Amino acid sequence: APAYAAGQAGRSPIAEQALRSRQGTYTSIINPDFIMAPQALTRKGFWMSARQDEEFRGMDIGDVDGDGRNEIVTITFTDIMIYRKEGKTLKKIHTIPGKSYVQLLSVDVADINGNGIPEIIISAVSQGIAGSFALEHKNGKYERIVSDVRMFLRVLRASGAPMLIGQQMGTIEPFQSPIYRMVWDGKKYRQDSRIRAPLGLSVFDFILDKLDPSGPEVVVAIDDLDYLRVYEKTERSIEKIHTVMGSKELLWKSDDQYGGTTNYFDLPSGMKYSNVTNEKIEKPAVNIRLTSYDVDKDGRKDLILVKNISSTGRVFKS
């Protein structure tokens, strides 16, 4: 058991490791193929593209066409756009247009089916219903290999090989359902074992990792109010963990807010979403990606996350 009190306000050893700086990051680092630096804008060799006209809602990187070079895959509200860094410029090499009624929420790049070509995995909703899908490069074009998955999908990669996780949309609240590992069965993604993460978290909220190499794997999450929380692996519900008296599952909660996003989606008529303070929210958020990496090569994982400062606040309360 940890040597610190569960849920205490002071810093635990895990928290000290996770948050060496309370100033957040200057840039969103999507996965280990991007710049690795605690302060990326001051790092020698840092590169920034020209301002893009599109409003990107998600981004990941990988060799999605099998040519040995990484592509940057982005999504807008409806479209998938693929870029490549060529010299000092960012060149758009492919656009996959979507439909106006299908809202794209997140994108991941990972070889889940094990054929050597990473899939482009999209979480999406259509008229308030989850309808995710995956694309793969075949015969010179991007083809759907999986369609209409009635789950939110996300890739976790912190502790080793990429792992696809999925979560069915709840009937009363969108994220009140268990999260499962998804595996490839030869034709589609299939639900496998349950992930031990607090019930009520969404697939967009958390990572699993050993922040301390000698410690256990923990759940690191950003809650609805943008506070960082560290949990033991558990299947207990958020409501039972977040009690006035505290709980052993909640190892630590930050004093400062991190994250921050304008990526929201509409719910079906009659459905509402309750945040950690039980306020009813009309539009749940898709959190900006958390990741972990040993930035300074000291054998311990560092958390890499965004701290956005916005004047809009949380404006979607009912």
Features from the language model and the residues they span:
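Beta-propeller-forming repeat regions
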Residues: 1-318
